[in-house]
Swiss-Prot record:
This is Guanylyl cyclase-activating protein 1. GO terms for molecular function: calcium ion binding; calcium sensitive guanylate cyclase activator activity. Ca(2+) 2 binds at residues 99, 101, 103, 105, 110. Keywords: Calcium, Lipoprotein, Metal-binding, Myristate, Repeat, Sensory transduction, Vision. Retina. Ca(2+) 1 binds at residues 63, 65, 67, 69, 74. Ca(2+) 3 binds at residues 142, 144, 146, 148, 153. GO terms for cellular component: cone photoreceptor outer segment; photoreceptor inner segment. It comes from Lithobates pipiens. InterPro entries: EF-hand-dom_pair, EF_Hand_1_Ca_BS, EF_hand_dom, Recoverin. GO terms for biological process: visual perception.
Length: 205
């Protein structure tokens, strides 16, 4: 799973791990979650091609050993990253999620498609359109103007821009997924969704 994921897993309590293990084995008695089961658990049906690609990309980034399954430790690492991951850890994961073709760079098309897919799944109605958000990201952090973002450009640029970090974190808030895991697959109503503390990844009161 790598050092990044190990650090977040170590921060989990035994109670949390036990609860997640019970839930995981209830939903997936075989101990290995397939991509199809991953979609099924979250009630993701009739997805657009872009949304379907996003979910498959998310699954692949959490399938750390690339065997086509998510086992319990990968499941824990994924959830701990969402709940307790530090900003840089989350940004590295976001980058992997955006880099659909795996070439080590994010282009405008990749970012735009992922943002559209996330908003469709999260049922977001942000004031800023996906196109405007994508333009803002590239205008602010594509330092060399080549139309692609390297990992270094992405992490350094986002961390230096408080507004961009806030918008990015809000756009990629995955706490609704954790809510569904903890509440037997029920979707979180928009009014229930927690505001995120940008610097720590925790919810604000």
């Amino acid at each position: 799973m790598g050092n990044m994921d190990g650090k977040t897993v170590e921060e989990l309590s035994a109670t949390e791990i036990h609860r997640w293990y019970k839930k995981f084995m209830t939903e997936c008695p075989s101990g290995q979650l397939t991509q199809h089961e991953f979609k099924q658990f979250f009630g993701l049906k009739n997805l657009s091609p872009a949304s379907n690609q996003y979910i498959e990309q998310m699954f692949d980034t959490f399938d750390f050993n690339k065997d086509g399954y998510m086992d319990f430790m990968e499941y824990v690492a994924a959830l701990s990253l969402v709940l307790k991951g530090k900003v840089e850890q989350k940004l590295r994961w976001y980058f992997k999620l955006y880099d659909v073709d795996g070439n080590g760079c994010i282009d405008r098309g990749e970012l735009l498609n992922i943002i559209k897919a996330i908003r469709a799944i999260n049922r977001c109605n942000d004031e800023m359109t996906a196109e405007e958000f994508t333009d803002m990201v590239f205008d602010k952090i594509d330092i060399n103007g080549d139309g692609e973002l390297s990992l270094e450009e992405f992490i350094e640029g986002v961390q230096k821009d408080e507004l961009l970090l806030e918008v990015l974190t809000r756009s990629l808030d995955l706490k609704h997924i954790v809510y569904m895991i903890q509440n037997d697959g029920k979707r979180m109503e928009i009014s229930e969704r927690p505001r995120q503390e940008i610097t720590t990844g925790n919810s604000l009161p």
